[in-house]
Amino acid sequence: MSIVAKRCGVKFTPPSIIIIYENKTSGKMRKRVIPVRNFSQYSDCSRAAERLKHHVRHSVYLECVSLAQLERLHLLLRDHLQGASLEESLAAHRHQEEEEDLNKLSDEELSRRKAQMDDLFQRNRRRRGDPDFVYDLEVEFGEGSVKETCSWDEEQSDQEF
């Protein structure tokens, strides 16, 4: 049975992971609700995600879903069990992703991240045919704008050379 995952998400009550997938043989879209059992606010999310991905019953549906995606979904579930709202949880994890060191990733993971960034760039890009496209956009920064100083802008560092 060939299955391609299209979307995945979480359901808070009862704690579940939801996979929307396409069955390639029949061409139909289906929804699978996978209950997350024995999961508490103190559970290890990476372990739970790995256990779920390799579960006999659910591995067929989760083979297209990355382990990192499953970990993020488990983090959302854990944050909900700890009392955080969905918005707070998403904001906290988005901030962690922004500070991630891309130099420490494997080549495969790095190329996947670059492809995601390129896709996001292409979606946000303004083209000539767009209604809000401006060819020569000029932006003036007012007098009240804050100027940030950098360590290399200091005059005393020039004396060292």
Swiss-Prot record:
It comes from the Eukaryota. InterPro entries: CEP19. It is found in: Cytoplasm, Cytoskeleton, Microtubule organizing center, Centrosome, Centriole; Cytoplasm, Cytoskeleton, Spindle pole; Cytoplasm, Cytoskeleton, Cilium basal body. Its main location: cytoplasm. One of its GO terms (biological process) is vesicle targeting, trans-Golgi to periciliary membrane compartment. Keywords: Cell projection, Cilium, Cilium biogenesis/degradation, Cytoplasm, Cytoskeleton. GO terms for cellular component: centriole; centrosome; ciliary basal body; cytoplasm; spindle pole. Residues 90-110 have a biased composition (Basic and acidic residues). Residues 89-110 are annotated as: Disordered. Disulfide bonds: none annotated. The keyword Magnesium does not apply. Required for ciliation. Recruits the RABL2B GTPase to the ciliary base to initiate ciliation. Belongs to the CEP19 family. This is Centrosomal protein of 19 kDa. It comes from Danio rerio (Zebrafish). The lineage of its organism: Eukaryota, Metazoa, Chordata, Craniata, Vertebrata. The gene is cep19.
